[in-house]
């Protein structure tokens, strides 16, 4: 090596090592394994540092395009691969969607989510969905859509329409994922989330528990979410609804205390996220839902139907919040 090469070698900037994950799976498992009271106490402390602990955001979810999906997700009634008796429908008209949003607002919702059963939207679908987004925002509602995988230009188009959140769940841990779906890779999901983030849209990303996964695999899902940089602003936690005709129709029901633990672990690992009680809430009695709020859930999907499965009735939800001394709040009013 020449003198010049030696000088060059000694002044070369060393390559930085990859940043260590904020949450190792082992760390998340350790949270799960805390005594129940200790876990909820820590989660509630974390929750109060960032949010009004008695405020809940009410969200309504509308299926704007039902059934006929190309994906083979083992939990989903809308997959064309499963015989669930669900008839495929076309994309709803804009006026019909806006009428549903208006009703949701009248019933107390402050967030309106629109879901379409697609592997990915075609470009021709984007324009009417942009109209829906603008119309819902004009009502003063927060907007979220879930349409499947997105291309970069599609994410940018939704951002230009003013979309607040894009939902694209990871569903489960990387290790368990292959047992649930074969038509879309884990990396496909991560790529869509990156495009959403790059477009300047808030990320809504969570998963489903109770699909037969182990606690370690539940911890793997939470670690994946918590280690995103930044972690999602919105984290829906779904409790599997076992639907006749799907591969998971006979899945063993999850211990409800494990569901509450998952809410608490999500709150601790993602302290500033909206943690949302999503599908499967009708499987939890009032006491378990109250424990979920204590564990840090600060949003719930509200209304009689959640995509194609049942949901506790709106009136029952209002009564539960009143019994608990809690109240529905705008997202902007939730922070402490």
From Swiss-Prot:
Reaction catalysed by this enzyme: (4R,5S)-dethiobiotin + (sulfur carrier)-SH + 2 reduced [2Fe-2S]-[ferredoxin] + 2 S-adenosyl-L-methionine = (sulfur carrier)-H + biotin + 2 5'-deoxyadenosine + 2 L-methionine + 2 oxidized [2Fe-2S]-[ferredoxin]
Gene Ontology molecular function, alphabetical: 2 iron, 2 sulfur cluster binding; 4 iron, 4 sulfur cluster binding; biotin synthase activity; iron ion binding
EC number per UniProt: 2.8.1.6
NCBIfam families for this protein: bioB (TIGR00433)
Cofactor(s) the record lists: [4Fe-4S] cluster; [2Fe-2S] cluster
Keywords recorded for this protein, A-Z: 2Fe-2S, 4Fe-4S, Biotin biosynthesis, Iron, Iron-sulfur, Metal-binding, S-adenosyl-L-methionine, Transferase
InterPro entries the UniProt entry points to: Aldolase_TIM, BATS_dom, Biotin_synth/BioAB, Biotin_synthase, Elp3/MiaA/NifB-like_rSAM, rSAM
GO biological process: biotin biosynthetic process
Residues engaged in binding [4Fe-4S] cluster: 69, 73, 76
Cofactor note: Binds 1 [4Fe-4S] cluster. The cluster is coordinated with 3 cysteines and an exchangeable S-adenosyl-L-methionine.
Family: Belongs to the radical SAM superfamily. Biotin synthase family.
SUPFAM superfamilies from the UniProt entry: Radical SAM enzymes (SSF102114)
Primary role: Catalyzes the conversion of dethiobiotin (DTB) to biotin by the insertion of a sulfur atom into dethiobiotin via a radical-based mechanism.
Residues where [2Fe-2S] cluster binds: 113, 144, 204, 276
Pathway: Cofactor biosynthesis; biotin biosynthesis; biotin from 7,8-diaminononanoate: step 2/2
Residues of the Radical SAM core domain: 54-281
Pfam families the UniProt entry points to: BATS (PF06968), Radical_SAM (PF04055)
Protein known as: Biotin synthase
UniProt subunit comment: Homodimer.
């Amino acid at each position: 090596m020449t003198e010049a090469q030696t000088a060059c070698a000694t002044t070369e900037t060393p390559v930085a090592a990859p940043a260590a994950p904020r949450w190792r799976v082992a760390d998340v498992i350790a949270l799960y394994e805390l005594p129940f009271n200790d876990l909820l106490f820590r989660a509630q402390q974390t929750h109060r540092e960032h949010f009004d602990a008695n405020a809940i955001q009410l969200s309504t979810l509308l299926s704007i395009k039902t059934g006929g999906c190309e994906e083979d997700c083992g939990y989903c009634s809308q997959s064309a691969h499963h015989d669930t008796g669900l008839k495929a429908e076309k994309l709803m008209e804009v006026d019909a969607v806006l009428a549903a949003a208006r009703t949701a607002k009248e019933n107390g919702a402050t967030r309106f989510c629109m879901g379409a059963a697609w592997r990915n939207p075609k470009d021709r679908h984007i324009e009417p969905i942009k109209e829906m987004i603008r119309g819902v925002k004009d009502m003063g509602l927060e907007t979220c859509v879930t349409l499947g995988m997105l291309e970069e230009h599609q994410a940018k188009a939704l951002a230009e329409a003013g979309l607040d959140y894009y939902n694209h769940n990871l569903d489960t841990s990387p290790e368990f994922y292959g047992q649930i779906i074969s038509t879309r890779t884990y990396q496909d999901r991560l790529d869509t989330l990156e495009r959403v983030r790059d477009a300047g849209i808030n990320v809504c990303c969570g998963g489903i528990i109770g699909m037969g996964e182990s606690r370690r695999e539940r911890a793997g899902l939470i670690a994946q979410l918590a280690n995103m940089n930044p972690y999602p602003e919105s984290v829906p936690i779904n409790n599997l609804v076992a639907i006749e005709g799907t591969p998971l129709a006979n899945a063993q029901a999850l211990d409800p205390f494990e569901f509450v633990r998952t809410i608490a672990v999500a709150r601790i690992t993602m302290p500033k996220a909206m943690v949302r009680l999503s599908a499967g809430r009708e499987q939890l009695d009032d006491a378990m839902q109250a424990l979920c709020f204590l564990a840090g859930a600060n949003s719930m999907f509200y209304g009689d139907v959640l995509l194609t499965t049942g949901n506790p009735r709106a009136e029952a939800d209002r009564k539960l919040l009143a019994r608990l001394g809690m109240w529905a709040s705008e997202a902007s009013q939730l922070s402490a």
